[in-house]
Amino acid sequence: MKPVKQSLLAAAVLAAFLVPAAPAFAQHAEHVVIAQTTATAKATETGAALRDLWVGHIFWVRNVVVETLAGNKKAAAAAEKEVVANAKQIAGAIQPYYGKEASEKLFGLLAGHYGAAKQYLEATAEGSKAKQDAAVKNLTGNATEIAKFLSGANPNLPFDTLNGLLLAHGGHHLLEIQQLRAKQYAEEAQTWEAMKKHMYVIADALAGAIAKQFPAKFS
């Protein structure tokens, strides 16, 4: 098993162990590699831009988590505004290929993703297992909806593969929240590194699939 696959599977298994209500994260974490295209300068540039946007997503969500757990409502609200702005940028990145309606659809789905993560954060801070379980269900369902949407738009993004990537990403959010809540800072630092690498996998998969679907735009 390749190192990337091992890290994703390990993160998902940890999330499932710490959150028994989320076995789906463990079941779908290991994924097959999406077929890659020969990189052109524009494809490389697009991939780098998507990496930056997806890392921005986890950066600002982490800030929301940190400030919420610290009780700093003003800072948490400021970070949340950045989460929303980042989601609009990620959604906007697909508009040149799929149109405004698709961009707006993706933004709504990304908003749902963040909403479920925030729901889990608040439930964890409150200590409510029932609310945690509800949040996990919402996060899992949202991952499936995003995978359906993107795989439907691009045949180079197999649903099962994309769903696994998104479920593993959700598992990272849960694990990070739990570790920060428990003040397990050294462990969370390792989770953060795994999250960044996973964002690269997702960004590269999206960029490669788009370049393959629209070769004329990348020639």
Segments the model singles out, each with a brief description of its role:
Residues V83-L121:
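Mid-chain, structured segments of secreted extracytoplasmic proteins
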Residues V4-K5, T46, A102:
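Structural motif marking the loop-to-transmembrane transition
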Residues E30-H31, A35, K42-A76, E80-V83, ...:
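C-terminal amphipathic alpha-helix
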Residues M1-A10:
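Bacterial N-terminal signal peptides that target proteins for export
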Residues P3, P20, E30-H31:
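N-terminal leader/presequence segments that precede the conserved core
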Residues F17-F25:
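C-terminal segment of classical bacterial N-terminal signal peptides
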